[in-house]
Amino acid sequence: MSAFCSRSTGPVAAAELFRGPQAEVTVAYQPLASPGGIIVQAMQHDRILRRELARRGMSLRFVAAGKGGDVIPMLQKGDAHFATMADMPLIEAVNVVPLSIIGQLKRNYAMVVGPRGLSAKDLKGKRIGNAFATTGHFALLKVLSSAGLSERDVALVPLDVNLMPDALRNGHVDAFAAWEPTPSLTIGRNPDRYGAIGRQQSISFLVSTREFTAQHPEAARQVAAALVRAMHWFKVDRSHVITAVRWNIAATEALTGAKPQVGEREYAKSARADLEELGYSPKMSRSLTSKRSLLLDAQEFLKSIGKVPRAAAEDALIGSFTYDIVEDVMKKPTQYYLSRFDYAP
């Protein structure tokens, strides 16, 4: 990690100055999600980001949350300006607070995990560990639906995702629904015992309140630049992933009060696979807002089973995608220091 003193990116417009009680810019994130947890850890340690925001009268704070649904009220109340969230909480969020979806953090799978040989139809009457209103919950709903079942046919056991593997191993639940890296790590450690009963593609994003991006567009671009820079940092040296994994394991322990069971190298291998799936870039494809996109299909499915209001409009979701922020930053790699790294230990 090399030190770098950033040059000025030009005069700071008066409208960009962020003074007074809101001088603190807050990013809410989930350290239990991969690879979003390690990406945000890199952003949190990014001195360039902090310097650029300081020039605009802004400080930076990161708040860890257990799941995406926990950050929705923070965005609503103005307690967070940026957040990471996956598909199901995102669909819920855009219907209650105007958002700008800035960049993509993952494209992997949420899974229902249980004993090998158990099928989706075998879940009837079973106890299933679940974190409500998460991408894991969405995967469970889809898997149950594929077998002609619904939530009423199973016993949902509310669990934090970090507790699910032990609950399954100890027989407290018969299966669990979770997002990466928990499913793959659980199966990888016990390949003869556990398998994926079903899975659903899961995507997650960095979002901002629309109010913040409208009032402070350059500050939003600086945060986007830190996101791009973090992924590039991971790409240029594989050891950087291990560094961020260590930071994230510490954040996870602080959040949950327990040391994660996963080892550093095991976690890093899973995170690298997720980063490679995105090409180490947060740039979003226009297909995300096509008529047959995963998100629109998910919204229609959630409406059909009463998980989001039937009045939820496609426009609220599609209109939240703000492609140009990351795209503008990537067109100006020198101005935004995309290949310069200065990460605090």
Predicted features, each with a name:
Residues 1-24, 332-345:
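Short, low-complexity disordered leader/linker segments with a strong preference
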Residues 10-158, 174-177, 194-200, 328:
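Short, glycine-/small- and polar/acidic-enriched structural segments
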Residues 34, 216-310:
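Secondary-structure end/capping motifs
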Residues 41-44, 76, 94-95, 124, ...:
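Alpha-helix boundary recognition
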Residues 45, 67-71, 86-89, 136-139, ...:
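Stable alpha-helical elements in mature extracytoplasmic
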Residues 95-97, 114, 188-191, 207-209, ...:
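Short secondary-structure transition/capping segments
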Residues 157, 162-260:
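Pocket-lining segment of extracytoplasmic ligand-binding domains
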Residues 294-345:
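Conserved C-terminal helix/tail region of periplasmic/extracytoplasmic solute-binding proteins
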